[in-house]
Amino acid sequence: MKIIILTTSTDHHLFFVNELKKKFEEINVILEKKKNHFSFKTSHNYQKKRKKFEKYFFFKDKNIKFKDEKIFYDVNNKNCINYIKKIKPSVIISFGVGLIKSKFLNEFKKVKVVNLHGGNLNYYRGLDSHLWTIYHKDFNNLLTTLHTVKEKLDTGDIILTKRVYIHKNLPFEGIRAANTVSCVDIVAKYLKAIKKNKIIPIKKNKIFGRYYSAIPSVLID
């Protein structure tokens, strides 16, 4: 079973990739370089604390890097699509890249294309879903969701979900790390089911949550 992971060059994504590589062979990694830009301030000191926390949490401050990755500016570009075609994957997993466009999906109609979303699709679509969930004090919806990818962002059918548990010993900057551990768990479960030809019931997504952009830094204070 050939697997493609579409992601970006961050410590939490590196941890995700490395953990799955321990469990599954023939994983190919594509890193997207494209960045989001906003008309409002999104940078916050919390992000520096988060980076430091994740470096220790995942790697005990060791300098770990991606290996054998392929880098493209945009996963939707022709060169990236052609590269994936040559690999002939059974599954494409998106974690942290930008919008996957229709031209990409049309090229891989026979491939399972799935995405990891840090929230409940029925309430929170878009960016920074965990932060928006916490902002609204909606702690019951702190979820990690694995869903199919459709043209409209975060409207795919739900494959698996897992709660992201927060506790008194978990700092605010550790929430993304906790979510990443949940991401590893549900993707491993999904891939094992495919490998064993087991059927995972997919829940039709009939309620599309509100779309949120990146959370402004002023709301984190």
Which residues does each PLM region occupy?
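One-carbon transfer enzymes
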Residues: M1-D221
